[in-house]
Curated annotation (Swiss-Prot):
Source organism, top-level taxon: Eukaryota
Organism: Xenopus tropicalis
Protein name: Basic leucine zipper transcriptional factor ATF-like
Function, in words: AP-1 family transcription factor that controls the differentiation of lineage-specific cells in the immune system: specifically mediates the differentiation of T-helper 17 cells (Th17), follicular T-helper cells (TfH), CD8(+) dendritic cells and class-switch recombination (CSR) in B-cells.
Region (Leucine-zipper), start-end ranges: 55-83
Gene it is expressed from: batf
Length: 115
């Protein structure tokens, strides 16, 4: 005569008895792993936020520097216009006679000084 497997009230076969200590140890390890993972994820999010903040600050600083440099370029262009005008006004009345720009400003036209 064959022995029938143990059945619970719903008619399912019961699983073989398991060690409560093993389950408890596995649960503890799961909880510890989840906690460790949660902390690692939190640190990762903090680093990501700090990096984004740092990039934002750097971007703002570069924008300010860019604006200042554009202002300086604008000022230098205005000064160039003014000096060109002064020179063109002075040339007709200059007693020294016509001179080549290279004699006055040797670096003008030289590729060595161009940026």
């Amino acid at each position: 005569m064959q022995q029938e497997p143990d059945r619970n009230e719903q008619g399912y076969c019961s699983s073989p008895p398991s060690s409560n200590k093993q389950d408890s140890s596995d649960d503890t390890k799961k909880i510890q792993r989840r906690e460790k993972n949660r902390i690692a994820a939190q640190k990762s999010r903090q680093r990501q936020t700090q990096k984004a903040d740092s990039l934002h600050i750097e971007s703002e600083n570069l924008e300010r520097l860019n604006s200042a440099l554009r202002g300086e370029i604008s000022g230098l262009r205005e000064e160039l216009k003014y000096l060109t005008c002064v020179l063109s006004t002075h040339q007709p009345v200059c007693v020294l006679g016509p001179t080549k720009p290279q004699a006055i400003l040797p670096h003008v036209g030289s590729t060595r000084y161009q940026h």
